[in-house]
């Protein structure tokens, strides 16, 4: 297996222009494909997940052109639901941001489409979404294991009253919300359980509004969506920088700054993961907010005990930053780490122990006490981009770290290690 050894980093300083947000890129691509008119997306993320969405749109007959660097995309909207001529199979890798929204969108009208992906995708639950779509009339068959992909979709979604469990993944609700305006009837979506990752729902609602569709949000408990609507192209749309990707550079500055400034997001960003900067500030770093940037300057870091349900992806970065904080850090209410690219609670606990931390892994929390000195370790990444990026922070000590399968960052940030090197000074 390929590996990358990072030598100790004495200091980080500089500016990082963030690649486009994965969450925003894939939502915007699908809405542009469903909309009337031509949409130009700029600062689109070029990554594995986005390529899976683009390949699916190609197979569904959507026409678009990409710039040479794949960050500008002109899409000719379909002006309504997407249809396949005859039976079709779409391979979506391990891209949850493609699998869930497409599973819903392709239940409109009449289709016969199979959605499948990598082995890990077949372990990521989708039953709550399928249950909700079936309540709205969709015909969906599990081809292997009940409640997991691959799925066969045969259309039939008309709207009506649907319930969806909000406690596992906000992507199920996102998929229903994006699909509902194009259904023939009104849809009322009721949330069962506590809704996780609410800020990701705000991204969805924000984008739907940009594409001309308003819905009624009743305190995140119930959503009322009028049927028979259509999405309208906004013309040109700039994809925000990826706030989750910003977390690694901001954390690096908190540990070994200097000052690092990330551009492409700012105080008015729609992504909930910008709140990660508040956590670093609470730990002792200095944060400065602009309209299109966030900067972080080193401080003495102290441990925290916090509910991280609002920033589950960026919270992973706090787990490795905790290695540099005084005291024991506890991250709570993060059960949904277990249903991501890998079981992130298990993976994080296992790898933190390798570098010498004392770790308690609970059902939905993790407690981390750093060692006096970090151990050298080979870090397994579990084909999870965030594991690779989080553990790069270990090099901000006086100990090198080896990252196995470093190219797994291609899921969201193909040149992550080059960008980290650019702002780093060797010890």
Curated annotation (Swiss-Prot):
Pfam families with a match to the protein in the record: EPSP_synthase (PF00275)
Binding site residues for phosphoenolpyruvate: 22, 96, 124, 171, 344, 386, 411
Active site residues of this protein: 313
A molecular function (GO) term: 3-phosphoshikimate 1-carboxyvinyltransferase activity
Pathway stated in the Swiss-Prot or TrEMBL entry: Metabolic intermediate biosynthesis; chorismate biosynthesis; chorismate from D-erythrose 4-phosphate and phosphoenolpyruvate: step 6/7
Binding site for 3-phosphoshikimate: 22-23, 27, 169-171, 197, 313, 336, 340
Subcellular location field: Cytoplasm
InterPro entries, alphabetized: Enolpyruvate_Tfrase_dom, Enolpyruvate_Tfrase_sf, EPSP_synthase, EPSP_synthase_CS, RNA3'P_cycl/enolpyr_Trfase_a/b
Biological function: Catalyzes the transfer of the enolpyruvyl moiety of phosphoenolpyruvate (PEP) to the 5-hydroxyl of shikimate-3-phosphate (S3P) to produce enolpyruvyl shikimate-3-phosphate and inorganic phosphate.
Quaternary structure annotation from Swiss-Prot or TrEMBL: Monomer.
Family named by the database record: Belongs to the EPSP synthase family.
Name this polypeptide is given: 3-phosphoshikimate 1-carboxyvinyltransferase
Organism of provenance: Shigella sonnei
Lineage: Bacteria, Pseudomonadati, Pseudomonadota, Gammaproteobacteria, Enterobacterales
Gene: aroA
